[in-house]
Amino acid sequence: MAAERYNPRVAEAHWQKVWEENRTFETDNSDSREKYYVLEMFPYPSGRIHMGHVRNYAMGDVVARYKRAKGFNVLHPMGWDAFGMPAENAAMQNKVHPKEWTYQNIATMKRQLKSMGLSLDWSREFATCDVEYYHRQQMLFIDLYEKGLVTRKTSKVNWDPVDNTVLANEQVVDGRGWRSGALVEQRELTQWFFKITDFSEELLAGLDTLDQWPEKVRLMQRNWIGKSEGLQVRFALAAGTAPAGFSEVEVYTTRPDTLFGAAFVAISADHPLAKKLSEGNAALSSFIEECHQQGTSLAALETAEKKGFDTGIKVKHPFDDNWELPVYVANFVLMEYGTGAVFGCPAHDQRDLDFANKYKLKVTPVVLPKGEDAASFSIGETAYTDDGVMINSRFLDGMTPEAAFNEVASRLEKTDLVGRPQAVRKVQFRLRDWGISRQRYWGCPIPMIHCESCGVNPVPRADLPVKLPDDVEFDRPGNPLDRHATWRHVKCPKCGGDARRETDTMDTFVDSSWYYTRFTAPWENEPTDRKAADHWLPVDQYIGGIEHAILHLLYSRFFTRAMKVAGHVGVDEPFKGLFTQGMVVHETYKANGQWVSPADIRIEEIDGKRVATMLDSGAPVEIGSIEKMSKSKKNVVDPDDIIASYGADIARWFVLSDSPPERDVIWTEAGAEGAHRFVQRIWRLVAEAAPALKDVAPKAGTQGEALGVSKAAHKAVKAVGDDIEKLAFNRGVARLYELVNTLSGALQQAADGKADAEMKGALREATEMLVLMTAPMMPHLAEQCLAELGGKVAGKETLVARAPWPVFDPALVVENEIVLPVQINGKKRGDLTIARDADQASIQQAVLELDFVKAALNGGSPKKIIVVPQRIVNVVA
């Protein structure tokens, strides 16, 4: 009898209710089974989830459900990264309080995530804007302050003039604010910093232990930490050019081997010498002010046009007093990096070459590529940055750059310049301390108090939390806390006199730098329960976008170490395994030059071409390129619409099946339709065969078609398990398609009453295996199918969500036959299929029975038959 169509709306709502009522996915910290902690980067509550969320959380859910089935005690929590500027912007634009806006969005997105059927432990849910969470963050801040890992200092900062707040270097992208897109300016402010540089060497060395991280991410962090071994060289100022009080410029370089190619020295706009020279020099003062309009990050410097101001001052070359180099103030040198001064070797650094060409400075190559002639070698528009041998370098000529480095260092270390060595070897790091002060309201208050008599001191622990006031106004840019009539006024905890609260709040990346530890015991009064944290950490599998490679992931690695120093955790690394998934992308569409939504168009196949028109008017629509889903280009697919039309399982299945998970997946209506048909096919095959299989005990077949069914199922169990372990979800999906194709004929026979007892036993086992393997990807369908089969696995009543992963029989997975290529006189003519354990005599006899061998021998006998075991057969005629 034909089964009714599978109704995902009814089934999904039912099974989600069953899981919730049974508290199926709540995790007990006291469970003695081996732990497995899987976590996807928690979302910012922007208002609605998008298909990127669906893909990210579907991947994590596959891992969580699979590991549960494999017998692990799985922690799979969810929360909300809820502080940040968008809430304040919404408050200004829509006249709604950030708290109200945020919690409304959380409610909407939680409903959406629940509709996906994710196996999350919602009992551990928190938002970083919950007072209970940021209370513990303030406790952590004070702990780190007392351990000397928090400092307050004046420094150049990146100022976002639109968001009116400070940005960390990592938050400046191509010279612009990462959220506002505004050109960033430099300002000098007193800020709070986490001393991440105390861990520079540890953070770098730790990358070598993270063998389950993508190499690309490790390389990005390695470059950002930026360890370099170089030489700090003192260049004496030429007589008669230096202002009073200045006698030298100290330069840090990683390429002292190229000193004989030097064409100039460049100093930062904030270098003491530059400041001195700007006194009474309007042109230089104006140039320095221009330099301050760009960001303070190295990324900002790399993208900005390279500019310099010739100071007229000269320095002497370290190896030749008669060789003088011009000194420029340059916009690509930062005071915070190295010594705030560099020497430029145009031939072997592209930035220096561009600068030299712009200001018509001499370009002298000093490293000769292999195979080039020193007499004719010259530099064009591209600097030579590879290895070679030294030329035009006097006593260094003929050396390798490495040997030249050591020779220069050795000589200058022994050279006295005014009572000190002219150079010293130095290790530098690109990494800078993490400035966390933000001039905004919607963030975690920094728990410090300023007193004119006592200085700056922490808020007493008994007075925590420092809560954000609700009665604030967002009628103009800037920080409402600065303008609050009462909140900022407080008594000094030391002298009892009038004092004021710190009105800066913490960078929101602080909130996400330790949330994974809080999930291990979110009910604790302390920031962590040390026993629970040490049990669950590190996170076994972390999933999220590669855009967080430097920001969130590096900060989290620092925070774990800092929390270890403060006694809150016992591990160094937060995430054992890291997976960075690709994006969900979609075609773009335009009508009359305006972007239009996929929901508003119709696409048809006409004369072999895809033609798009507007649904309402029939107007033609231009089909554009495939791009990341974005609201601005309207190529967004709403998960709510997909789930309403097809169901959550189909949305999950499609984003897992269409491409390798590390690559982008292209969302198409045709792909969703294909997934829908597959779901209906599985349901029809199982439901129609269920009456014949419901009361049958599962048992592997031993012969004929029943054995074939069992072999296919057991091979799939092994392969799909291996695929999920490797996070190769698309390969696992492909194997399930294959298994359904293999089982379909036999299941139809069972539905028609044509299967014998052995086939029924084999089919019952194979169908249970299919259902259990499908469950991590399509959990609702799996539960519905098992219920149709009587709700039992291996004879025991269970939910699929609580059922163990099927176990394959190794004997059924091994191939008993082998295919051997057969050559005649060294050329392949065909293949021989034979038992894997066949001996040499049997193989030789079987080869002689092959038609193409008989034809080649023409009734005669071969001179010999060479058998390479398990590899190949060669007949010598």
UniProtKB/Swiss-Prot annotation:
It is an enzyme of class 6 (ligase). CDD domains: Anticodon_Ia_Leu_BEm, LeuRS_core. GO terms for cellular component: cytosol. It catalyses: tRNA(Leu) + L-leucine + ATP = L-leucyl-tRNA(Leu) + AMP + diphosphate. A motif ('HIGH' region) lies at residues 43-53. PANTHER family: LEUCINE--TRNA LIGASE, MITOCHONDRIAL, LEUCYL-TRNA SYNTHETASE. This is Leucine--tRNA ligase. The lineage of its organism: Bacteria, Pseudomonadati, Pseudomonadota, Alphaproteobacteria, Hyphomicrobiales.
